[in-house]
């Protein structure tokens, strides 16, 4: 059995659909059912993999209690279960933890700080995991992210802008600058 968190989100939903298409036994968890699952799930011995994609991903969120509960505490709880039952885990971090440098973690907003907190926790417990893979996503895009509005990837925003106006404008005077968006 595979646990996938964040199944109402862009990446989690794609994991869920792909695994189901392959006939895998999947337990899907989103914010509506997360605390119920935490209190009631008791089949950890049957879990083969945890794919933890669930989080508040809004980089403009300033509700620290929510970020702490979802992005930090729930992630630590899942990681502890992965350690306790020696379940491999795939964890969604974020390239936003780097801030303005790639040399060290330097988060510039509360979302990035919440992700960096888990990255550090994982680093402190790395030898206890059977297997952990941390993915630091950056500007992920694709079908099904239209609902994200201002939080949609640059590629989605660019495509919409070009479709609507026939032009691409990043910001005032952007025709004089070069930008690299790794997608």
How would you name each of these model-derived features?
Residues 71, 111, 115:
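Active-site YXXXK catalytic motif of short-chain dehydrogenase/reductase
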Residues 5, 29, 50-54, 89-95, ...:
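SDR active-site strand-loop-helix element
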Residues 26-42:
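Adenosine-cofactor binding site in Rossmann-like domains, unifying the SAM/SAH pocket
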Residues 40-70, 99-101:
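NAD(P)H-binding glycine-rich loop region in Rossmannoid oxidoreductase-like domains
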Residues 50, 62-89, 121:
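NAD(P)-cofactor binding segment of oxidoreductase domains
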Residues 76-110, 133:
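Conserved Rossmann-fold NAD(P)-dependent oxidoreductase catalytic core, especially the SDR/UDP-sugar
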Residues 110, 120-181:
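NAD(P)-dependent short-chain dehydrogenase/reductase
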Residues 2-21:
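N-terminal Rossmann NAD(P)H-binding glycine-rich loop of SDR-like oxidoreductase domains
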């Amino acid at each position: 059995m595979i646990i996938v968190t964040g199944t109402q989100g862009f990446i989690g939903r794609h994991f869920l659909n792909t695994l189901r298409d392959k006939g895998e036994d999947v337990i899907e968890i989103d914010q509506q059912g997360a605390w119920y699952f935490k209190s009631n799930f008791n089949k950890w011995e049957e879990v083969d993999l945890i794919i933890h994609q669930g989080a508040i991903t809004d980089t403009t969120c300033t509700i620290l209690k929510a970020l702490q509960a979802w992005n930090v505490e729930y992630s630590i709880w899942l990681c502890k279960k992965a350690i306790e039952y020696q379940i491999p885990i795939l964890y969604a971090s974020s390239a936003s933890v780097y801030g303005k440098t790639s040399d060290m973690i330097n988060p510039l907003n509360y979302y990035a700080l919440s992700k960096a907190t888990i990255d550090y926790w994982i680093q402190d417990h790395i030898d206890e995991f059977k297997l952990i893979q941390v993915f630091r996503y950056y500007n992920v895009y694709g079908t099904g992210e239209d609902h994200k509005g201002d939080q949609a990837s640059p590629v989605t925003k660019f495509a919409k802008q070009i479709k609507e106006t026939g032009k691409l404008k990043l910001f005032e005077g952007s025709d004089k600058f070069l930008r690299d968006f790794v997608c």
